[in-house]
A protein has these predicted regions:
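Acidic, glycine-rich loop-and-strand cores that form catalytic or ligand-binding grooves
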Residues: 553, 561-616
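Short beta-strand-to-coil "C-cap" segments at the C-terminal boundary of structured domains/repeats
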Residues: 302-304, 603-604, 644-649
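Sec-dependent signal peptide recognition
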Residues: 3-12
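Active-site rim elements
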Residues: 518, 540, 550, 554, ...
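Surface polyanion/phosphate-binding segment centered on an Asp-His-Pro turn
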Residues: 334, 338, 377, 627-649
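N-terminal signal peptide c-region/cleavage motif recognized by signal peptidases
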Residues: 15-16
Length: 649
């Protein structure tokens, strides 16, 4: 009798499936913009002072492992993808070119990733080597090997997976304007084909090979304020300003132009959305997670095995598809947690050891071509400021560099060349490729560029004939919330002239503006003071701290950001204190009250030199260019600030 009822029950299930169709579930799990951050840190974005601990890569490992076990029991499938920018951002990622992060991804059992903009930071050969380490494919269908004339052998354009009776294609795409955003050497040997045409070709290929559902893995990004940005895009399309041939399209724009993509997993912007974006034209779903592995994305796709299509989707929580990796909610898997802890500890020690090691061979950037500036003669009467017997350093926030494209590059190159100063510290470098072009106009100079910043870069440009670069380091990159994702760029140098020489450290930083900026500036400077005081105690007394501090020395009480340094006058002094009350010397004259926001601080190792004749001044560049309007249009809204000190025999 029991057997009779069992057979009848099975028959009813079979009939129901025939009538109603069978629906299976595909758990789409995704990450993007990890930036080498698989360690545990406090969630300061929730509570800057007492942030709950996050579980990091070990928490992600625990979540995905448990999900896979549950899915197996229920007959569901799991797909784990990454949208790029996986290793740049911490020494854990950059010291070995991303190999440690790939080893973690192997343990996570990723199905695929697509390389992002910052994944090219150490060149194509490095990515190729990482593909050999990875137990999963790297995907991109629009990258062509210059020599072979086809997809590089280490990249796959498409992979296929079977989900029940449904064939799934995962196609890869890389941002087609990466060569315009990176150092030329970083993408050497590759052609980046137009995104839309490549995507259309891949979709067609996938369909011809029997794919029922197509998931695209594309490093394109969903911007902040996605609704407003999409409306702007539609307006640009209607006016002919944006089309299928446009370069640098974001994920929403590409999905609007390309039919046949069911889901697009993207990265490149560290802004997560709890609900997918659905294109009103193609109905493509687009998903993007927050960056730095603060969470993991999880969308439950419902697959109709009868129609072999996506019939809907569900969220794993009431909040949506983003799972914040809080330790209180998701405990780190113990063995993985211990492994990551040791990786981080070793990376910190190695990074600091390299910074203080003394290599007799000077470091050079040998991968920049020397170009001539477009203008045949100098446009502006830039004064000569450099003298051989003194050390000069300028700090200059070049707002959203380059603000006016090649015009900015020409003006900045002419200025730096004609100044003739030993060092120029820059902030707000938005486009690294443009910075490379700037340096190609300055063959007598070399540079140090930040490696760990997540929102614009800092650089130190120096004259090769008087300054030798030794090493760089970016402290706090494992926990850079207080520094607004821009950890200080530290670099050790030797200044030399005839028989004189002096070893010293330069710290270039760009502190948080606006919002909770005051609190974060205070905390970041407390951290920096304590670190530099430790360096001085260990015998490194020659330190210069420059940059856009985004605050004034004249503030008082609780509104003062610089208290940690001001309360230690026997160790540190502000060169800019001398001009702090002089509005004619304001580095940011646009404020309601013209202000000095760009400062230079020096440590006790330079006290004697300052007393011998140190000078501080703001450089009134609007007088050089002819007007403030022109200066602001092509260079910056900040004036540069220069400090000079004599270096005695």
């Amino acid at each position: 009798m029991n057997r009779f009822y069992l057979l009848r029950f099975i028959s009813l299930l079979f009939i129901a499936n025939l009538i109603f169709g069978q629906t299976t579930k595909l758990h789409l799990v995704f990450t993007n913009d990890i930036h080498g951050s698989i360690h545990q840190i406090p969630a300061r974005f929730m509570n800057p002072e007492f942030g709950p601990m996050m579980s990091g890569g070990a928490g992600a490992f625990a979540y995905v492992s448990e999900l896979r076990q549950e899915a197996k029991q229920k007959g569901d499938d799991v797909l784990l993808l990454d949208g790029g920018n996986f290793f740049q951002g911490t020494p854990l990622g950059t010291l070995d070119g991303g190999e440690t992060i790939i080893r973690w991804m192997n343990q996570m059992d990723y199905d695929a990733l697509t390389p992002g903009l910052r994944d090219f930071d150490q060149g194509v050969e490095n990515l190729k080597q990482l593909s050999n380490v990875a137990n999963f494919p790297m995907l991109s269908g629009n990258l062509i090997d210059d020599k072979a004339g086809q997809n590089p052998e280490w990249l796959k354009p498409i992979i296929y997976k079977q989900i029940g009776q449904t064939k799934l294609a995962i196609i890869g795409l890389t941002q087609d304007n990466i060569p315009e955003l990176s150092f030329p050497k970083n993408t050497e040997g590759l052609q980046f084909l137009p995104a839309v045409a490549s995507a259309q070709k891949q979709v067609k290929t996938a369909k011809l090979n029997g794919a029922d559902i197509i998931i695209m893995l594309a490093h394109l990004g969903i911007p902040y304020n996605r609704k407003d940005e999409f409306e702007t895009f539609l307006s640009q399309v209607s006016q002919g300003e944006t089309s299928v041939e446009s370069k640098g399209l974001n994920a929403m724009e590409l999905a609007h132009f390309v039919e046949g993509i069911d889901v697009l997993v993207t990265g490149g912007v560290a802004k997560g959305y709890n609900e997918p974006w659905e294109d009103p034209n193609t109905h493509t779903l687009i998903v993007q997670n927050y960056g730095n592995l603060s969470g993991i994305g999880h969308l439950e796709l419902l697959i109709d095995q009868d129609t072999k299509s996506i019939s809907g989707y569900e969220f794993p929580t009431d909040r949506g598809m983003l799972i914040t990796l809080l330790q209180d909610d998701i405990l780190p898997e113990s063995e993985m947690g211990e492994t990551v802890h040791h990786w981080v500890k070793d990376a910190k020690l190695k990074a600091e050891k390299q910074f203080f090691s003394r290599d007799t061979n000077p470091k050079k950037n040998a991968y920049l071509k020397t170009l001539k500036r477009l203008s045949e003669s100098d446009r502006f009467p830039v004064p000569s400021l450099g003298k051989p017997e003194q050390l000069e350093i300028v700090t200059w926030n070049l707002e959203w560099f380059p603000a006016a494209g090649d015009t900015t590059l020409e003006a900045a190159a002419e200025t730096i060349q004609e100044w003739g100063v030993d060092m120029v510290a820059l902030q707000e470098i938005k486009n690294i490729n443009a910075f490379a072009k700037l340096m190609s106009f300055l063959p007598d100079h070399d540079f140090v560029l930040s490696k760990q910043s997540s929102f614009m870069d800092q650089a130190i440009i120096y004259r090769k004939d008087v300054v030798t670069f030794l090493a760089q380091y970016e402290p706090f990159s494992f926990d850079d919330y207080y520094f607004a994702g821009r950890p200080p760029l530290m670099a050790n140098f030797i200044w030399h002239y005839e028989e004189r020489q002096r070893e010293f450290m330069v710290v270039n930083m760009h502190l948080k503006c606006c919002g909770d900026g005051l609190y974060r500036r205070q905390k970041s400077l407390e951290q920096l003071h304590d670190l530099l005081a430790q360096y001085i105690e260990n015998g490194n007394e020659n330190i210069i701290v420059v940059g856009d501090w985004n605050d004034q020395l004249t503030d008082t009480g609780l509104n003062q950001s610089f208290t940690a340094f001001l309360d230690d006058p026997d160790t540190f002094q502000f060169a800019t204190m001398e001009i702090s009350g002089d509005t004619s010397q304001a580095s940011y004259p646009k404020w309601i009250v013209p202000s000095i926001l760009d400062h230079i601080l020096y440590s006790k190792g330079f006290f004697d030199e300052q007393a011998l004749g140190g000078k501080i001044q703001t450089l009134r560049m609007e007088e050089v260019l002819g007007s403030w309007e022109l200066y602001e249009e092509i260079l910056s809204d900040h004036r540069p600030v220069m400090w000079t000190i004599p270096i005695p025999d």
